[in-house]
Amino acid sequence: MPDNRRSQTITQGAQRTPNRAMLRAVGFGDGDFDKPIVGVANGFSTITPCNMGLDTLAKCAEHALKTAGAMPQMFGTITVSDGISMGTEGMKYSLVSREVIADSIETCVQAESMDGVIAIGGCDKNMPGAMIALARLNVPSIFVYGGTIKPGHYQGRDLTIVSAFEAVGQHTAHKIDDHELLEVERHACPGAGSCGGMYTANTMSSAIEAMGMSLPYSSTMAAEDEEKRISAIRSAEVLVDAVKKQILPRSLITRKSIENAVSVVMAVGGSTNAVLHLLAIAHAAEVEFSIDDFEAIRARVPVLCDLKPSGRYVATDLHKAGGIPQVMKMLLVHDLLHGDCLTISGQTIAEVLKDIPEQPRADQDVIQPWDNPVYEQGHLAILKGNLSSEGAVAKISGIKNPSITGPARVFDSEETCMAAILERKIQPGDVVVIRYEGPQGGPGMREMLSPTSALIGEGLGDSVGLITDGRFSGGTYGMVVGHVAPEAFAGGTIALVQEGDSITIDAHRRLLQLNVPEAELERRRAAWHPPAPRYTRGVLAKYAKLVSTASRGAVTD
C-alpha cells in the first residue's frame, strides 16, 4: 500500500482536479500529490503560558515533515487556561474543551483524509483531548508536549502557580501582607510552559509517554529549552516512519499500555484528573478499563517521586534526575510494567528502556530508591460507600490524617463555599461538601483548586475534609475527595446531605460514608427533585445533555 493510502482519495485521478487545484494554492507542487499528508494539530495560543511556545514546535515539525518526504497541513485547535479561569464560571468550559479539542482534531483529519497526525498541546485538556481524537481516528499519530514551565523564585524558594493560589488563603489569614502577595504573583510564572509541578498537564504528558505515544524524555522537558525543539523535529521524523509502517494508535493504546500509564501516574504522584482522562482515552480506543482497575494498580505500585504539590520538586527536576524512562525502568524491573507494549518508534517498551539503569542516580533525591519510596502504595485511591456507589477519587499523598469524621458543611456551588472559607466560617473537623458541580450539574465539573488552596493557606489543610462531585486541580492536596458519583444533579446521595450530617472519609478503608440511617435517606430521596438545568442554550447545555458519569470518564459519545 502507498504511504498516501488515505489522502489519495483527494489527490489522485481526473475527478480530483478541483481538489488538487485548491491544494496547489496552499503550496503543493506537481511532485507532492503522491506524498503522505500529515496534519499538524497546533494548540498554539497566547491565552496561557502553557501554549504560547507551541507555534515554534509546530514550525519545527512542519519543516521536519517536509524534509522527511511528507506534506504537512497545519491547523489549529482551541485551548482554555484552567489557571486563569479557575474559581470562575469560565472553569465550567475546561472539561468541555477536552471534547471540543477531540472533536475538532477528528473532524479536520477525517474531512481532509490525512495520512498521519502530529498533535501539539500544552494546557491540561490538550493532552487527553488529543489522545481521545487519535484513538478514535486510528491513523498513525504522535503527540508532542509543549513542555513544562521552569519554577519561579522568591526569597530563596521555588514557586509554582499553586504558590499563588495558596498565597490567597495566607493573605486572608494575615500570614502574609499585600506586598508579599504581589511578589508571589509577580514571580510564580516566569515564562512559557505548563504548570511546573506534577499537576494535570505534566501528569498526562507522562502518561502519554508511558503509553508509547510520545518520545522518551519528552514529557518532562522545559518548554523553553532547545531540546524541546529537537524533540519536535524527531517526533515528526518518527511519525513519517510510522506512516510508512502503519503503526496505529490502537496498536499502542491497549489495556496493557493503559495499565502502564496508570502505574507511572501512581509512581510520579500524579493528578486525580488522570483517572477521568485515562478512562476517556480507553473508551475512545474501545479498551475495557474501569475505575476499579485504578484501585487494583494503586495497591501494588509505590510513589517513587517527591514532586509537588505535596512533595518538594517540579517536573524539570524530575527530568534532570532521569525523567519518565528512569521511573519506568524501575517499574519494569519489579514486574509492574508491561515491557512488550509497542511504542510509536516501533520498539517495545523493554527495548526503549534497555540501556536505562535499574536504580536512580545516587546524587539526586527526586526519584527515591525502590526500598525507600515516598509512599509504599499509590496515592490515588478509589473510595466507595453510600456517598459514592460508583466511586470517588481521593489523592491520599501529603495528608497527615488518613481519616476524618465530622459535620457536613454543605454548599451548592463553589462560589458559596469559597465565600464561607474567606469569611473564616469553616472550622477544624468540618467536612465541606461542594455539590451540583458534576459533569451534568455544573455543568462541566469545575476544579476546586481555589477552595482547597484557600483552606491550606488558612492552615486548615490537615484538619478539614472536602468532598465534591466536581474535580480537583492537579495542584490540589489534602483530605479531599472528588469525582463523587453518582453526582448530585443525577440524584446521587451527595444531593441528600444536609448541614450538620456526619460524614466519614477514610482513605485506608477506601470509604466515603454519610452516617445517616437508610430510612432517613429514603425519606430524603423521595422528597428530592432535580434542579432546573443552569443552562438551556449553547455549548454547556449541549454538553450537559451528552456527558456521562465521572466514573466512566465524563465522555460524550
UniProtKB/Swiss-Prot annotation:
Lineage: superkingdom: Bacteria
Cofactor(s) demanded: [2Fe-2S] cluster; Mg(2+)
Residues binding Mg(2+), per UniProt: D82, D124, K125, E447
Enzyme Commission code: 4.2.1.9
One of the GO BP terms on file: L-valine biosynthetic process
InterPro entries assigned to the protein according to its UniProt record, in alphabetical order: DHAD_IlvD/Edd, Dihydro-acid_dehy_C, DihydroxyA_deHydtase, DiOHA_6PGluconate_deHydtase_CS, ILV_EDD_C, ILV_EDD_N, IlvD/EDD_N
Pathway where this protein functions: Amino-acid biosynthesis; L-isoleucine biosynthesis; L-isoleucine from 2-oxobutanoate: step 3/4; Amino-acid biosynthesis; L-valine biosynthesis; L-valine from pyruvate: step 3/4
Annotated positions of the N6-carboxylysine modification: K125
Residues the record lists as binding [2Fe-2S] cluster: C50, C123, C195
Cofactor binding mode and count: Binds 1 [2Fe-2S] cluster per subunit. This cluster acts as a Lewis acid cofactor.
Keyword Cell wall biogenesis/degradation: no
Enzyme class at the top of the EC tree: lyase
Keywords: 2Fe-2S, Amino-acid biosynthesis, Branched-chain amino acid biosynthesis, Iron, Iron-sulfur, Lyase, Magnesium, Metal-binding
PROSITE patterns documented for this protein: ILVD_EDD_1, ILVD_EDD_2
Gene3D superfamilies in the record: IlvD/EDD C-terminal domain-like
GO molecular function: 2 iron, 2 sulfur cluster binding; dihydroxy-acid dehydratase activity; magnesium ion binding
SUPFAM superfamilies: IlvD/EDD N-terminal domain-like (SSF143975), LeuD/IlvD-like (SSF52016)
Keyword tRNA-binding on entry: no
Subunit field text: Homodimer.
General function of this protein: Functions in the biosynthesis of branched-chain amino acids. Catalyzes the dehydration of (2R,3R)-2,3-dihydroxy-3-methylpentanoate (2,3-dihydroxy-3-methylvalerate) into 2-oxo-3-methylpentanoate (2-oxo-3-methylvalerate) and of (2R)-2,3-dihydroxy-3-methylbutanoate (2,3-dihydroxyisovalerate) into 2-oxo-3-methylbutanoate (2-oxoisovalerate), the penultimate precursor to L-isoleucine and L-valine, respectively.
Family per similarity comment: Belongs to the IlvD/Edd family.
Protein name from the UniProt record: Dihydroxy-acid dehydratase
Source organism (scientific name): Nitrosomonas europaea (strain ATCC 19718 / CIP 103999 / KCTC 2705 / NBRC 14298)
Organism classification: Bacteria, Pseudomonadati, Pseudomonadota, Betaproteobacteria, Nitrosomonadales
